[in-house]
Regions:
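Conserved small helical "lid"/interfacial subdomain of P-loop NTPases
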Residues: 154-174
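Conserved nucleotide-sensing/catalytic segment adjacent to the nucleotide-binding pocket
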Residues: 84-124
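Post-Walker A helix-loop "phosphate-sensing" segment adjacent to the P-loop in P-loop NTPases
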Residues: 66-77
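A short, basic N-terminal segment
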Residues: 1-39, 44, 204-229
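Walker A/P-loop nucleotide-binding motif
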Residues: 45-61
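C-terminal helical "lid" of AAA+/P-loop NTPase domains
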Residues: 179-183, 190-204
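Conserved AAA+ ATPase "SRH/arginine-finger" region at the nucleotide-binding site
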Residues: 145-157
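Short regulatory helix/loop adjacent to the ATP-binding pocket of P-loop NTPases
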Residues: 128-143
Length: 229
């Protein structure tokens, strides 16, 4: 078995990802969602749902919209004051399918938004018709919402995202290295985040540059982890 280079524990420095409107990477798969955000408050309906896979850019778009509107984050659970908050201004409910919600509470939020002319943005990995809704009135309200889907990233977007993620960590990388990664990685922005995070960690711990060999090791690790799941 090949012995791996000695790894030291790297110092952890904070590296906040750039998440403003000017940092948003534009591609065909994001164009509809970006248009919705940019056209606030002239939305086709007061409730908008952005649906897409993990790491597809939903959180970035939601963050931009929240900065634009001053929206409050809500979680419509039983007994919450989410509907009252929605009556006063725009509200954001992220990761709907993962966080879960109370049917009646979300129904009242949507009614409050419609009655008071505010706005509700929700993000989800699943389309709303796949949510576990049992309240017929809520299902009817969700059918009236505007749903925008974000698809899987293409090579061009993955390349842009990798360069951005490396730049967020103040790392300079060769175009050929990025092309190597793009050609071999899973088509997912979440995977791009994992690749950059792991590459940065290994390079720091071993005191080495970002190389093709290091990238190959990281990609193999991630592939093996997927096979083990």
């Amino acid at each position: 078995m090949t012995k791996r280079p000695y790894e030291q524990l790297p110092l952890v420095f904070r590296h906040d990802p750039a998440s403003g409107r000017e940092d948003l990477l534009v591609s065909d798969r994001l164009s509809a969602a970006i248009a919705i955000i940019d056209h606030w408050p002239d939305w086709p309906s007061p409730v908008v749902i952005i649906a897409g896979p993990v790491g597809s850019g939903k959180s970035h778009l939601a963050s931009i919209w929240r900065q634009m509107t001053g929206a409050e984050v809500i979680h419509p659970t039983a007994g919450s004051n989410a509907a009252d908050i929605a009556s006063a201004g725009p509200v954001l409910f992220e990761d709907v399918d993962r966080q879960g919600f109370d049917d009646t509470a979300l129904f009242h939020v949507i009614n409050s938004v419609r009655q008071n002319g505010t706005g509700l943005l929700m993000t989800s990995r699943l389309w709303p018709m796949s949510w576990p809704v049992t309240l017929p009135d809520l299902r009817s309200r969700l059918k009236a919402a505007t749903v925008v889907e974000i698809g899987e990233p293409d090579d061009e977007l993955l390349t842009q995202v990798l360069f951005k993620l490396f730049a967020d960590r103040q790392l300079l990388v060769d175009e050929r290295l990025v092309a190597y990664i793009v050609n071999r990685m899973e088509r997912s922005l979440a995977t791009a985040q994992l690749v950059v995070e792991r590459l940065d960690h290994l390079a720091l711990s071993r005191g080495t540059r970002l190389t093709r060999a290091l990238a190959a090791e990281v990609l193999d690790e991630l592939a093996n982890a997927r096979c083990a799941d």
